[in-house]
């Protein structure tokens, strides 16, 4: 299973790659404003890495209810499935952007936000959560 983690946004789309051993690695974010260019680059990333599954962050609120961007993400998920013919797995993205941003030194955050680094780190967290659920580590032998 080769996965592409996606943190969807209207300005930037964060990406991460998951390999066969269950490790997520951030990729450069798609920051081009032109949607056609973004779709082309997304298709190139899927083809280059021979992706078999797409893992998309889904906006839930802290109380577990669906977030206000859910309809937009639902439409994006449907478009992904139609365009690439791959399964799309939705994963709770609650607090991933905050966690990704907090992993960057405070003095560097301002310039980094527009670069897409936070978005790709968030995609990495989303994907790693999926991979950890799909392939849990073996239980320790307590004998």
Range-by-range predicted roles:
Residues 1-6, 10-143:
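Phosphate- and other anionic-substrate recognition elements at nucleic-acid/protein interfaces
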């Amino acid at each position: 299973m080769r996965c592409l983690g996606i943190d969807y946004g209207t300005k930037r789309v964060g990406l991460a790659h998951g390999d066969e051993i269950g490790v997520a690695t951030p990729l450069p974010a798609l920051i081009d404003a032109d949607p056609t260019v973004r779709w082309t680059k997304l298709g190139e990333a899927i083809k280059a890495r021979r992706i078999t599954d797409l893992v998309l962050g889904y906006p839930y609120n802290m109380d577990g209810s669906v977030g206000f961007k859910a309809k937009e993400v639902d439409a994006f998920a449907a478009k992904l499935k139609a365009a690439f013919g791959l399964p799309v797995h939705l994963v709770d993205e609650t607090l991933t952007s905050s966690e990704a941003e907090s992993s960057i030194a405070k003095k560097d955050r301002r310039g980094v936000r527009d670069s897409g680094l936070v978005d790709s780190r968030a995609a990495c967290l989303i994907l790693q959560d999926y991979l950890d659920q799909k392939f849990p580590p073996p239980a320790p032998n307590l004998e």
